[in-house]
Design a protein with these regions (language model features):
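Flexible internal linker/loop segments at domain or repeat junctions
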Residues: 268-290
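Eukaryotic phosphotyrosine signaling hubs
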Residues: 135-139, 209, 295-296
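ER-lumen resident redox/N-glycosylation machinery signature
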Residues: 86-95, 127-129, 282-285
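Bacterial N-terminal signal peptides
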Residues: 7-17
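Helix N-cap motif at beta-to-alpha junctions
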Residues: 43-45, 145-147, 217-218, 303-305
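Core segments of cupin and vicinal oxygen chelate
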Residues: 41-112, 169-170, 214-267, 314, ...
Length: 354
């Protein structure tokens, strides 16, 4: 059942959460050097940005591919729909021939990677919202300084709630609630621990940002992220009943595998649900296209792109377009597709960009 946060008084209690990410060493055998942006596509760039800005204090940011600039350079504002771009190279990269598009680069406090919204026009797109248990679903997890304050803002906006009972629940990672942004994209909000708040390097509502993706089979996902890309495995555990309820589930189990993106201390969670055969609604896998509202995308910095593409193809993984990188002044770009339909962009910076 989908609930809505209405303007009511809510009392919430702070519990533990992990600290914000920092740069870390890259394993010698990993082609991944970091994460530029976590991207999801939107049906309305302004509406989505205002939600994240007004709820979490997220700000516009410069594109990581914009080149050098002065410290005081302002981020590019959101382009009006009438000025949405059209570029044959982007069509080749994203398999969106004939489309127009615009992007919004954002930055959350205490987050070592960027957030990006992309919006496409003049091309068919799906608007099916994901449920947490759908293979290929994703969500952003914001661990925040003051959950009460964030929930109050969500309540004012009458935000749709996925969590059973409509309020935050106690979990091993702190009190948490799962909601939907204006597009229906999943956003989990957790209360940070006192230690995490004290250790935060920057002010702002967000203490840490994590990425969560739902997978059909954990072992298959690990073959892609750990074996092919060198993501670092940090642990696996079974979710508590409260964590199931946070995700709108009352029956079954959830196995959560926590990983780190090489090069930065950014957390990625692989979520493998096991639900009864008669569970309703049933799990519905995704076949994402870049233009689909909610389409999740990693934008990874990589080294040795040609060798990585060869290994990716040899392992039987698909590419979004023809699998040939496009060349930009910054470097080369190409999209692979993970076993559950998540779009994974490989970006190899040129020597000059490095």
């Amino acid at each position: 059942m989908r609930r809505t946060l209405w303007p009511i008084s809510v009392a919430l209690v702070a519990c533990a959460a992990s600290a914000a990410g920092v740069t870390r060493a890259v394993p010698s055998d990993s082609p991944v050097r970091g994460l530029y942006n976590w991207i999801h596509s939107t049906g309305d760039a302004e509406r989505s940005f205002f939600f994240y800005r007004d709820t979490f204090g997220i700000e516009l940011a410069r594109s990581p591919f914009a080149g050098e600039s002065s410290a005081n350079a302002r981020p590019e504002p959101i382009r009006p729909v009438s000025q949405a771009g059209s570029d044959a190279l982007v069509w080749a990269l994203t398999n969106t021939q004939g489309s127009r598009f615009r992007t919004v680069f954002m930055r959350a406090a205490n987050t070592p990677f960027g957030l990006e919204l992309s919006e496409f026009f003049d091309v068919p797109r799906s608007e099916r919202p994901a449920n947490p248990w759908d293979p290929g679903a994703s969500k952003l997890i914001f661990t925040v300084r003051d959950l009460d304050a964030v929930v109050a803002r969500l309540t004012t906006r009458r935000t749709a709630v996925v969590t059973i009972g409509g309020g935050a629940l106690d979990t091993p990672n702190g009190r948490a609630i799962l909601v939907r942004d204006p597009d229906g994209y999943l956003v989990e909000v957790r209360q940070a621990s006192s230690a995490a708040i004290t250790g935060a390097k920057a002010s702002g509502a967000v203490i840490e940002t994590s990425i969560w993706i739902s997978v059909a089979r954990r072992e298959r996902a690990l073959a892609f992220y750990e074996k092919l890309l060198g993501f670092q495995l940090r642990g696996t555990r079974t979710a508590t009943d409260a964590e199931l309820r946070v995700n709108g589930v009352t029956q079954g189990s959830l196995t959560q595998t926590v990983m780190s993106v090489p090069g930065i201390e950014a957390t990625v969670v692989l979520a493998d649900f096991a639900r009864p055969a008669n569970a309703n609604p049933a799990a519905m896998p995704f076949e994402w296209r870049v233009q689909d509202v909610g389409a999740p995308q990693f934008q990874l910095e990589v080294a040795g792109l040609d060798a990585l593409l060869e290994r990716t193809a040899r392992a039987g993984y698909r590419f979004l377009s023809v699998g040939e990188p496009i060349q930009r002044p910054f470097g080369r770009f190409v999209f692979a597709i993970d076993p559950d339909g998540i779009l994974v962009e490989f970006v190899e910076p040129s020597t000059r960009a490095q």
